[in-house]
From Swiss-Prot:
The keyword Membrane applies. The keyword Membrane applies. It comes from the Eukaryota. It is a multi-pass membrane protein. GO terms for molecular function: G protein-coupled receptor activity. One of its GO terms (cellular component) is plasma membrane. The lineage of its organism: Eukaryota, Metazoa, Chordata, Craniata, Vertebrata. It comes from Mus musculus (Mouse). Belongs to the G-protein coupled receptor 1 family. This is Putative G-protein coupled receptor. It is found in: Cell membrane. Keywords: Cell membrane, G-protein coupled receptor, Membrane, Receptor, Transducer, Transmembrane.
Length: 10
């Protein structure tokens, strides 16, 4: 399936 990348910055 598709790859998902998520990035969170505080």
């Amino acid at each position: 399936g598709p790859q998902q990348e998520n990035m969170m910055e505080e």
